[in-house]
Every structure is written in structure tokens, then in C-alpha cells.
Design a protein with these regions (language model features):
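A cross-family structural signal marking well-folded subdomains
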Residues: 19-22, 59-251
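Short loop/turn segments at secondary-structure transitions that flank enzyme active sites
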Residues: 1, 10-11, 178, 200
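Extended, regular secondary-structure scaffolds
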Residues: 2-79, 84, 183
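Histidine-centered nuclease catalytic patch
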Residues: 254
């Protein structure tokens, strides 16, 4: 894997932290990383090209894995407003399960880094692969994924051309997963909360500048204060009368 990256770099291709994370995942056999890498790649491929399922089914090793049944529904999926690539899947699963948003941290955790002692420990690598695998499986859940897409469409975003920021959509799905797992949140209100957050962050371009830094802050503050408390704070700070009377008008004029 390292040799492949060296060859890619020699040709001037720019690699990001998700690429490095995928290299670590693909090279890992001990904790099932090689099969996890396939699941991530296959999901992103099927979300764009459902008919490719027949080709995927030829991979007998994968079809006998825990992931195969999680992807089967995609062969009949024709939804186009959310077709995540491997970068999106990794980012969402990471934010959801680890409470962090900086992808370089995922690379370090998969390598076993202890952020407190600055040492590398095998148990941290094992735990990190386990958490990431769990996050990816939750990401792929048909009911969860489909209901999230329906929520976004119900807010008026009915076509992919209306989605002006993929990373904003990524955070919205992360939030959907987090709220589903939060016992303190009324499950009947999750769609409502996610829609409000998505519309607010879209209108204010919250994740356009330094997205990882802002998402990292949001994730940590949601964990510390609870979603409802933090949402009220962010809403009050960003959707004041000044925003509606001046900032939004200027945005619509450009």
C-alpha cells in the first residue's frame, strides 16, 4: 500500500487524510480492515451504480462477510441526492463513533496512538477498528439512511443540484446517527431537529471555511452540553435579526 501511495505522489496527485486512513484499513487483516475497506468501497460504488451489485456478488469472500447483507438494499436504490464516496463514509462513521472530526486523528487511532501518553498501543488499534466497523455498519443501515434522505427531501432539497455542500450533508447524517443513539432525545423529533440544523448550517455556510475545525467543535460541544442546549445557543448566535435582514439578503444577491 505504501508503495502505491509513493507512486501516486510521484505523479503529483494530492492525497488527503481519508486516503491514508483507507491505506491503513486496507492493509489490516488482524482486525478485519481489509474487508471493511471493501465494504466502504462497494457501498460508494453501489450508491452511484446499483446495477454493479451483480459484479460485487462475484466476490465470494465478501458475500460471506458481515457486510454483504448490509449493502443488499442498494441494488434497488435509485436515490441521487446523497451518494457518499469513501471519504464521506469514513468521515461520518468516524465523527459518529469517536466524537472527533479531524481525519488525521482517525489515521493515528487506527495506528494505535494514545493521545494522552503519545505512545502506540495495540489495544487502541483494535478498539479503533472495532468502533469504526460499528460506525460503518450503522451508516449502511437501510432504514436509517433512507429516512435521513427523506428528511432532507422534506426540507425542499429534492435534487442533488440543490445540495451546495457535501460536507454539510455529511454532518447532518452524523447528527442523525448521534440523535438516534441518544436516549435523551425524543425519537419522533429527530427528523425535525436534523432538518433545522441542516438548513441553518446551509444558510450560514457553517462548514465551508475550516470545516474539520468547526465540525470538531460542534461534535464535542454536543457531547458536553447535549444537543438541544447547544442547538439553541448556535441558533441564537447565528440566526439573529442581523442575519435575516442583512447577511441573508447579501448572500442571495451574490
Amino acid at each position: 500500500v505504501t508503495e502505491i501511495f509513493i507512486r501516486i505522489n510521484s505523479q503529483g496527485a494530492k492525497l488527503n487524510q481519508a486516503d491514508f486512513a483507507m491505506s491503513k484499513i486496507a492493509a489490516n487483516v488482524t482486525y478485519g480492515g481489509n474487508m471493511l475497506r471493501k465494504a466502504i468501497d462497494y457501498f460508494s460504488h453501489l450508491s452511484v451504480q446499483p446495477e454493479w451489485y451483480a459484479d460485487m456478488a462475484k466476490d465470494k469472500e465478501f458475500m460471506n462477510s458481515i457486510f454483504a447483507s448490509k449493502l443488499r438494499w442498494l441494488k434497488d436504490d435509485r436515490e441521487e441526492i446523497f451518494d457518499p464516496d469513501y471519504n464521506d463514509i469514513l468521515r461520518i462513521a468516524f465523527m459518529y463513533k469517536f466524537g472527533r472530526a479531524k481525519m488525521k486523528d482517525l489515521v493515528s487511532l487506527l495506528g494505535g496512538r494514545d493521545f494522552e501518553t503519545r505512545e502506540y498501543k495495540e489495544e487502541i488499534a483494535e478498539n479503533s477498528f472495532g468502533q469504526l466497523t460499528s460506525g460503518v455498519i450503522d451508516f449502511m443501515n437501510e432504514y436509517t439512511f433512507s429516512n435521513f434522505v427523506l428528511a432532507i427531501k422534506s426540507a425542499g432539497f429534492i435534487a442533488s443540484k440543490l445540495i451546495n455542500s457535501q460536507i454539510t450533508l455529511d454532518f447532518a447524517y452524523t447528527l442523525y446517527l448521534l440523535l438516534n443513539a441518544d436516549p435523551n432525545i425524543d425519537k419522533t423529533q429527530i427528523k425535525h431537529y436534523v432538518i433545522k440544523w441542516y438548513v441553518m448550517t446551509t444558510l450560514t455556510s457553517r462548514y465551508i471555511t475550516s470545516p474539520e475545525t468547526v465540525m470538531d467543535m460542534d461534535i464535542k460541544r454536543i457531547q458536553e452540553r447535549g444537543f438541544l442546549t447547544y442547538f439553541r445557543e448556535v441558533e441564537a448566535a447565528n440566526l439573529s435579526d442581523t442575519f435575516w435582514d442583512i447577511a441573508l439578503v447579501q448572500y442571495l444577491e451574490t
